[in-house]
Regions:
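Generic structural signal for residues in well-ordered beta-strands
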Residues: 32, 161, 233, 257-259
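Charged active-site motifs of nucleotide-sugar-dependent glycosyltransferases
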Residues: 2, 191-198, 231-232
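A donor-sugar binding/catalytic signature common to diverse glycosyltransferases
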Residues: 38-40, 260-281
Length: 281
């Protein structure tokens, strides 16, 4: 089968990579084309030749109405590119991973064009904008949920779904972070042997620019308290990001604020507390 998968952020890249592994295992002849990131691309290259990555999410993950308005032209161009690419490739199914701001529009278009549409990791309609349930009913052929409490919710709403647990649990269980000691983690990242408070701002550009100033203010105030003066604050950055995304926020705080990339599980494991932006983390 031909699978067209769309993931628009770091969490979707993680979910997408695990999904792709499962697809290749169940369907060795699977042909996959996708929007995603490094993790999905790594799985693709293990099983297929050529280029499967259409759009890297790092080139434009955005949040909120203001960000969409400011980047309306590029957003519109991405829709055009996406629709044209799906039409040209003609997949057996379009699989959408979370990212509702973009994927709901794709779901509507793909459904109206006669493509099967699967939504993997249901959008959090139970938390906000519940009216989107109408779109799920109208445009999605199969909905995959990951939280047990979603079972009675979607049952009550009359939406058919598939529940097989949460793939993040498998990812955490298989993480090398669980096999590494605190001493090894600190040594590998050249970190001092002091208590850790984790800071998780999110992976999107908009999240980083919105949350890092808040997190740095928090770190400053905590560091100024005698009982927390020796703590280190570790920013758990997405693997897709670089130090340039954080340097202006960390500047002048290097003595007590550190940044590590692609090690969220390890940072959380070895932290005594965490401040976490809403999201997959």
């Amino acid at each position: 089968m031909k699978y067209y998968i769309i993931a628009g952020e770091a969490s979707g890249d993680l979910h997408g990579s695990n999904l792709m592994r499962g697809l290749y295992q169940e369907d060795p002849a699977a042909d996959i084309r996708f929007w995603g990131g490094d993790m999905m691309n790594e799985v693709y290259k293990e099983h297929q030749d050529g280029v499967g990555l259409v759009q890297d999410y790092k080139d434009g993950a955005i949040i909120g109405f203001i960000q969409v308005a400011l980047k309306a032209r590029s957003y519109f161009e991405k829709f055009k590119r996406c629709f044209a690419d799906i039409s040209s490739w003609n997949p057996d199914v379009v699989i959408l991973i979370d990212y509702p701001g973009f994927n709901f529009r794709v779901a509507e278009w793909a459904h109206n064009k006669g493509f099967k549409v699967y939504y993997y990791i249901a959008p959090k309609v139970w938390a906000s904008r519940e009216g989107r349930i109408k779109k799920l009913k109208a445009f999605v052929d199969k909905l995959f949920i990951v939280f047990p409490f979603e079972i009675p919710y979607f049952t009550k709403k009359g939406i058919d779904f598939i529940y097989k647990g949460n793939p993040l649990i498998d990812a955490i269980d298989n993480s090398v972070a669980l096999k590494e000691s605190r001493e090894e983690f600190l040594r590998r990242n050249s970190l001092p042997d002091s208590l850790v408070i984790a800071l998780m701002a999110g992976s999107r550009t908009g999240e980083i620019s919105s949350m890092m100033p808040v997190f740095m203010e928090f770190a400053d105030k905590m560091h100024a308290l005698p009982e927390y003066a020796d703590y280190q604050f570790i920013v758990a950055a997405a693997p897709s990001r670089s130090m340039s995304d954080y340097s202006k926020y960390v500047a002048g705080r290097e003595a007590y604020v550190k940044v590590v990339f692609g090690q969220s599980y390890a940072v959380l494991l070895h932290a005594v507390a965490a401040v976490v932006n809403s999201g997959t983390a």
